[in-house]
């Protein structure tokens, strides 16, 4: 995802803007890799494989639909489908964290706090920029992968704190 930042300005555009340029090939490769990566990472933390495959397919279909003023229906679906899939994925992460409370209540509470912090940061970015741009897209992807990583590994939360602090400092620097 970060490599694609060299092809557009993340504060003013999002990844979809690559679809309408000569770099569209990279956009489609990114869509495939992103979908596979998220799908395989979710497989490591849950046994609901059919649900994840269904969600991943819808996410991919939404990403590859054309976003162009000549195709308003496709443009609407291009925005609505991936956004819905991300919201469902975030709700599913909250569900996984809730289930983690049964086996590791203290760790689950700490993960839930990180989950809340991440959602707050993303909401702050959406309010601040008043549109979905590349920075928000990258933040959401990093956030989902971070929570999945912590759920998968169940490592000490201090390591997770260092990673999130580094992300926060980097994002503050970009402002």
What kind of region is each of these model predictions?
Residues 56-108:
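Membrane-proximal helix-loop-helix units in multi-pass membrane proteins
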Residues 2, 56-65, 118-127:
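Aromatic-anchored segments of alpha-helical transmembrane domains
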Residues 50-53:
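Cytoplasmic-side transmembrane-helix entry/capping segments in multi-pass membrane proteins
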Residues 5, 9, 42-45, 64-68, ...:
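Transmembrane helix-loop junctions and nearby membrane-interface residues
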Residues 104-171:
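Terminal transmembrane helical module of multi-pass membrane proteins
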Residues 17-25, 68-82, 128-137:
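Membrane-helix interface and helix-disruption motif detector
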Residues 28-40, 85-95, 140-153:
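Hydrophobic cores of alpha-helical transmembrane segments in multi-pass inner/ER membrane proteins
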Residues 1-44:
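N-terminal topogenic module of multi-pass integral membrane proteins
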């Amino acid at each position: 995802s970060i490599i694609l930042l060299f092809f557009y300005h993340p504060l003013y555009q999002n990844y979809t803007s690559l679809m309408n340029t000569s770099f569209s090939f990279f956009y489609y490769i990114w869509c495939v890799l992103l979908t596979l990566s998220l799908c395989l990472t979710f497989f490591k933390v849950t046994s609901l494989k059919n649900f994840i495959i269904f969600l991943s397919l819808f996410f991919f279909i939404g990403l590859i639909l054309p976003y162009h003023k000549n195709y308003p229906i496709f443009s609407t679906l291009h925005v609505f489908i991936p956004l819905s899939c991300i919201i469902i994925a975030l709700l599913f992460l909250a569900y996984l964290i809730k289930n983690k409370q049964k086996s590791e209540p203290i760790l689950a509470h700490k993960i839930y706090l990180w989950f809340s912090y991440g959602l707050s940061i993303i909401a702050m970015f959406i309010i601040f920029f008043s549109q979905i741009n590349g920075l928000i897209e990258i933040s959401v992807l990093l956030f989902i992968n971070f929570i999945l990583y912590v759920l998968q590994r169940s490592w000490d939360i201090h390591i997770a704190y260092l990673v999130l602090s580094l992300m926060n400092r980097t994002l503050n620097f970009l402002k």
